[in-house]
Amino acid sequence: MRIHDLDPENRPRERFLRTGPASLSPSELLALVLRSGTRNNNIIDTCNALIARFGLERLADIPLSELQEIKGIGQAKAMQIIAVFELNKRIHYSRNLQRKVLSARDVFEYMAGRVPDITKEHLFVLHLNTKNQIIRNEQVTVGTLNASLAHPREVFKSAIRESAHAIILVHNHPSGDVEPSNADRQVTEILRQAGSFLQIDLLDHVIIGVDTWFSFREHSLLT
């Protein structure tokens, strides 16, 4: 069944105009973005298939080639999907750029949706001003954290350029287990010492998982 075959009152566009976007399902909202299906694929069914395969939460991180594996999703529609989620990320980033960080929970909430590929380990450095507001968020490395990847030169280079008062390290564990490894501890200590020499405080190192986090400061591992 095509959208035009539906009762007019039940079509996504008409319901949107009548009752607002909150009344539509995720598939219906996505259908409004993609607008039309193909001769053999209802756009609602196509959007249902997308969400069933990838899940709504993961849809923002699926690459172009994988989106096109869904019947009815060509390159143009896959680009539309990625563009919508990318725009949302940038809006979220802009709103939170000078967010004040007072705890590891603040860091965890700030980083929600900012890890581009949760199947890989990423190291980010948050630059803070004297009011503990984030003035920059920089991705430094991709891959298992170790001393060669997280060299003080790379970590502090932009912090010096931005005249940051302090930094917070953030990295994710793809496994979801946020317990720090020996390498995590060693890298943190090396960077703490480097920050002390440069007079740029390392306020915390926060390891994030899917729904939890580990704070070096809260566990008294930064002295």
From Swiss-Prot:
GO terms for biological process: proteolysis. Residues 100-222 form the MPN domain. Residues 1-17 have a biased composition (Basic and acidic residues). SUPFAM superfamilies: JAB1/MPN domain, RuvA domain 2-like. PROSITE patterns: MPN (PS50249), UPF0758 (PS01302). A motif (JAMM motif) lies at residues 171-184. Residues 1-20 are annotated as: Disordered. Gene3D superfamilies: Cytidine Deaminase, domain 2. The keyword Metal-binding applies. The keyword Transmembrane does not apply. Keywords: Hydrolase, Metal-binding, Metalloprotease, Protease, Zinc. GO terms for molecular function: metal ion binding; metallopeptidase activity. InterPro entries: MPN, RadC_JAB, RuvA_2-like, UPF0758, UPF0758_CS, UPF0758_N. Zn(2+) binds at residues 171, 173, 184. Belongs to the UPF0758 family. This is UPF0758 protein Cpha266_1761. It comes from Chlorobium phaeobacteroides (strain DSM 266 / SMG 266 / 2430).
